[in-house]
Amino acid sequence: MNIINKIEQEQLKADVTPFNVGDTIKVHTRVIEGGKERIQIFQGIVIAKRGSGINEAFTVRKISYGEGVERVFPLHTPRIAKIEVVNRGKVRRAKLHYLRGRIGKDAMIVKSANR
């Protein structure tokens, strides 16, 4: 069991930007199409974080052309180039799945003043 933990520790990213549920973030993802590699940006609200260590993942939700789009990203994947925090949100829940049923201003998160 100790060997597994040691290998997992080697695979963890050291430069992960700290963020929480409710924050609006930009996830810069490396996309390989054919032989070319480019960066694709996915901006939205973090509605959930789960797991720990190498298994840690987070879910980001945005509204694109009137449709809700959610994407789950593993935190320590090499496909993520960087994560930028756009706004810090003030929420009282660990999971914001209730945002799925809300549209427009009703789905907005209050900005945090001190975080």
Swiss-Prot record:
Keyword Ribonucleoprotein: yes
InterPro entries in UniProt: Ribosomal_bL19, Ribosomal_bL19_sf, Translation_prot_SH3-like_sf
Pfam (any one): Ribosomal_L19
SUPFAM superfamilies, per the entry: Translation proteins SH3-like domain
UniProt xrefs under Gene3D superfamilies: 2.30.30.790
GO terms (BP aspect): translation
Keyword terms, alphabetized: Ribonucleoprotein, Ribosomal protein
Job of this protein: This protein is located at the 30S-50S ribosomal subunit interface and may play a role in the structure and function of the aminoacyl-tRNA binding site.
Stated name of the protein: Large ribosomal subunit protein bL19
Originating organism: Akkermansia muciniphila (strain ATCC BAA-835 / DSM 22959 / JCM 33894 / BCRC 81048 / CCUG 64013 / CIP 107961 / Muc)
Gene from which the chain derives: rplS
